[in-house]
């Protein structure tokens, strides 16, 4: 038997096999699954069509009403009501709305509902976030979610793995958001199509678990099936006291076969900005800051960069500063816990004094939902993960993706800017 990657080991175990090979199709037991207010209603309708009366296990399913909540209109309210009634009927334990809801990919790891070594599916494309914990986590359609809710299983084609190795010392102001943007800029939005992106190297080891989540979150933006990072002491420390189930640690074998290995010297990487209308359109900040690109709005938040460390970064730049005239700065902590801790640390005070609007935990403007939609001709710098045409509003608006540092600096100067221009 040849060596296997961490992703292959997780799939093999959950499929009840000793080994799997790329290209093989397996039926595997799923540890945890979830949907949101956009994807759950269709899954429920499909579940009804299957004709099963009860979900396979109400403790292994979550419904997180995070996209259009607090309800933005009647349709959103009806979607949430439909999902809520199903959760009550089925006795689904992990149902989140109102004061306990957070952006799903922040909330579920925080609560210990997704764990190392697990096989996780979610009816949301950024489910790959949990790969930061050493899980095989991937987005599925509502139909696959419905079948999994009924059976506890899902089918997978075993993907090949690309190993990314990051070495060297990070420059000032460079974050994991810059690393993943640089990577996508290098390989392209199809560069890891249906592959696993395995992130490794001394730089990844030094990143916090929250920073790692930013990287795995955006694996899908390179076309990947998922992103994954081997668990280490930091991972175990993160899940300690949170874990709702027992879990198992997997690591890639020394002789594991990779589709390819890509190495980066991070000392040459500076903060990145992804220009419209693809995350691969990356430009280093030294160049972007000189282009005098005026902006109308800045959004700091989302499942990519709405965690406590991200808000601390923003506060580091915003403290004692004011948002530029005619610029709207919207900050969305990604969970109630993050919101509460940001308040305790005085971050919210810094944001309010700077002239920011602080909203509740919601996906909101990231997908053009609400709480920060762009008009025709408007430009935004955002810490979110996608900048497709019309992603955050009007088809003739523009979205520039960046880290919390760059986003905060841009809000202050009213144009795409480097934090070095603000923090002396």
UniProtKB/Swiss-Prot annotation:
Cofactor binding mode and count: Binds 1 [4Fe-4S] cluster per subunit.
Pfam families for the chain: Aconitase
Reactions catalysed, as given in the entry: (2R,3S)-3-isopropylmalate = (2S)-2-isopropylmalate
TM stretches of this protein: none
Pathway(s) per entry: Amino-acid biosynthesis; L-leucine biosynthesis; L-leucine from 3-methyl-2-oxobutanoate: step 2/4
Keywords on record: 4Fe-4S, Amino-acid biosynthesis, Branched-chain amino acid biosynthesis, Iron, Iron-sulfur, Leucine biosynthesis, Lyase, Metal-binding
GO molecular function: 3-isopropylmalate dehydratase activity; 4 iron, 4 sulfur cluster binding; metal ion binding
Quaternary state and interactors: Heterodimer of LeuC and LeuD.
Record's function text: Catalyzes the isomerization between 2-isopropylmalate and 3-isopropylmalate, via the formation of 2-isopropylmaleate.
Classification via HAMAP family: LeuC_type2
Name used for this protein in its record: 3-isopropylmalate dehydratase large subunit 1
